[in-house]
Swiss-Prot record:
<dbReference type="GO" id="GO:0046872">
    <property type="term" value="F:metal ion binding"/>
</dbReference>
<comment type="similarity">
    <text>Belongs to the methylthiotransferase family. RimO subfamily.</text>
</comment>
<feature type="binding site">
    <location>
        <position position="151"/>
    </location>
    <ligand>
        <name>[4Fe-4S] cluster 2</name>
    </ligand>
</feature>
<comment type="function">
    <text>Catalyzes the methylthiolation of an aspartic acid residue of ribosomal protein uS12.</text>
</comment>
<dbReference type="Pfam" id="PF04055">
    <property type="entry name" value="Radical_SAM"/>
</dbReference>
<dbReference type="GO" id="GO:0103039">
    <property type="term" value="F:protein methylthiotransferase activity"/>
</dbReference>
<protein>
    <recommendedName>
        <fullName>Ribosomal protein uS12 methylthiotransferase RimO</fullName>
        <ecNumber>2.8.4.4</ecNumber>
    </recommendedName>
</protein>
<dbReference type="GO" id="GO:0051539">
    <property type="term" value="F:4 iron, 4 sulfur cluster binding"/>
</dbReference>
<keyword id="KW-0004">4Fe-4S</keyword>
<dbReference type="InterPro" id="IPR007197">
    <property type="entry name" value="rSAM"/>
</dbReference>
<feature type="binding site">
    <location>
        <position position="50"/>
    </location>
    <ligand>
        <name>[4Fe-4S] cluster 1</name>
    </ligand>
</feature>
<keyword id="KW-0949">S-adenosyl-L-methionine</keyword>
<dbReference type="InterPro" id="IPR006638">
    <property type="entry name" value="Elp3/MiaA/NifB-like_rSAM"/>
</dbReference>
<feature type="binding site">
    <location>
        <position position="82"/>
    </location>
    <ligand>
        <name>[4Fe-4S] cluster 1</name>
    </ligand>
</feature>
<dbReference type="InterPro" id="IPR020612">
    <property type="entry name" value="Methylthiotransferase_CS"/>
</dbReference>
<dbReference type="Pfam" id="PF00919">
    <property type="entry name" value="UPF0004"/>
</dbReference>
<keyword id="KW-0411">Iron-sulfur</keyword>
Length: 439
């Protein structure tokens, strides 16, 4: 029997879903604490930070300072994760309010650090395995599964390899065991994640690692649905797209950050790819029946000229991505682009405004295309007093949209799980739908 300590833990997980997996591992080590969202009453405040770009760093620092102001006498404030790792040599002096610092190598030792009240920074980046206990958050039917850490790409703008290291793939058997264990607990929808998912097993000399994973998950038959995030263009192939299309479990969801479409900009960004390769992959994705395509764009990278931007703008309007994230270039230390001559902020802001207008138009059309059609969806939980929260099975959690189901139209309460639903109305990035049947 697990005995709860009479102590409260407030965990704040910032940044990406990969960070969330590490946060859930820490929760697994601290299972004997009572969870709270109140930083003022918590005995331990644990902030898993993000250090990817300037805005994320500022959010992490502000969250730490707010927690330091709120924490009660005797409470322990911990800063873990990417920000701590990236600035480990100076962060202790910059933010003395923190009691314990740790980076990206010791999530599974958080209980020991708290007991000893000491910092810890291991050289090896931590990679969650099937035997690491996790407390899944946010859903009783969906879980993230991290398949690798680190990245071997050399993008001009990205600092991730400097603090996450080179590509480190999990063994396929470990991933299958984790998927099976989670499915037995009711988590039958999964999102597989990494910094560069399409390079899975490249570090072990295998170029078809992700194809192997998809085939093995299909054969295992433990899951009902899954999707993959963060495909990298240079390691994505037509065979991979075809494998996803033919899978009975993996959805026709293609999340491939292209960052730009101009050949000259792709070269400046050191993306190790070309416009022709991008177009070949994107066209193949669009040919897949009921495909959903998401991407990410960086605006204002050093030396981006007006012609290159216009080429990008015209392409985005023509291709019509279902979802598009648009970021302003962030100058990051230890990157090639850091010291290059910058595009003025005024120009960057104007370009972002223009692209956001294009992205919103096509996003709304993507939502509206689902109206009055039966779609497969995952119902996750109650949203307020009157609605259940759901999402299209092709969507990733949190980022791609929300579907609400009015409980007044139901004969009996819904259990979280897989349903066929019919969206009937759309407003403010939310679809309203009714349930047709479970599946």
């Amino acid at each position: 029997m697990q005995i709860k300590e009479n102590k409260q833990l407030c965990l704040i997980s910032l940044g990406c879903s990969k960070n969330l997996v590490d946060s859930e591992v820490m929760l697994g080590k601290l299972y004997n604490y009572t969870l709270t969202n109140d930083t003022k009453s918590a005995d331990v405040i644990l902030i898993n930070t993000c250090g990817f770009i300037e805005s994320a760093k500022q959010e992490s620092i502000q969250t730490i300072l707010n927690a330091a102001k709120d924490k009660k006498k005797g409470a322990i404030l911990i800063a873990s994760g990417c920000l701590s790792e990236r600035y480990k040599d100076e962060i202790k002096e910059l933010i003395p309010e923190v009691d314990i610092f740790t980076g990206v190598g010791d999530y599974d030792k958080i209980d020991i650090m708290i007991a000893k009240k000491q910092n810890q920074f291991s050289e090896q980046v931590f990679l969650s395995e099937h035997y690491n206990a996790r407390i899944i958050t946010g859903s009783s039917v969906h879980a993230y599964v991290k398949i690798s850490e680190g990245c071997n790409q050399k993008c001009s703008f990205c600092a991730i390899p400097s603090f996450k290291g080179k590509l480190q793939s999990r063994e396929l058997d470990s991933i299958l065991k984790e998927a099976e264990n989670l499915a037995l607990k009711g988590y039958t929808d999964m999102t597989f994640i990494a910094q560069d998912s399409s390079s899975f097993l490249y570090d072990k000399g295998q170029k078809d690692g992700l194809i192997q994973l998809i085939s093995a998950i299909d054969k295992q038959q433990a899951l009902k649905s899954a999707r993959i995030l963060y495909l990298y263009p240079s390691s994505t192939t037509l065979e991979l797209i075809s494998t996803i299309e033919s899978s009975p479990i993996f959805q026709n969801y293609f999340d491939m950050p292209i960052q730009h479409i101009s050949d000259s900009m792709l070269k400046k960004m050191r993306r190790n790819s070309s416009q022709a390769h991008h177009l070949k992959l994107l066209d193949a994705m669009k040919q897949v029946k009921e495909s959903f395509i998401r991407s990410t764009i960086i605006v204002g990278h050093p030396e981006e000229n007006e012609g290159e931007f216009e080429e990008l703008s015209a392409f985005l309007d023509e291709f019509r991505f279902d979802r598009l994230n648009i970021f302003a270039f962030s100058a990051e230390e230890n990157t090639h682009a850091y010291s290059l001559e910058k595009v003025p902020k005024k120009i960057i802001n104007a370009r972002i405004k223009a692209l956001n207008k294009i992205a919103l138009k096509h996003q709304n059309n993507s939502f509206k295309a689902l109206l009055n059609k039966p779609i497969k969806a995952l119902v996750e939980n109650k949203e307020g007093e009157y609605f259940y929260k759901a999402r299209d099975l092709r969507w990733a959690p949190e980022v791609d949209g929300e579907i609400l189901i009015n409980d007044s139209e139901l004969a009996t309460p819904l259990k979280p799980g897989h349903y066929t639903i019919m969206p009937s109305a759309f407003k403010d990035n939310i679809l309203l739908a009714k349930v047709l049947s479970p599946f």
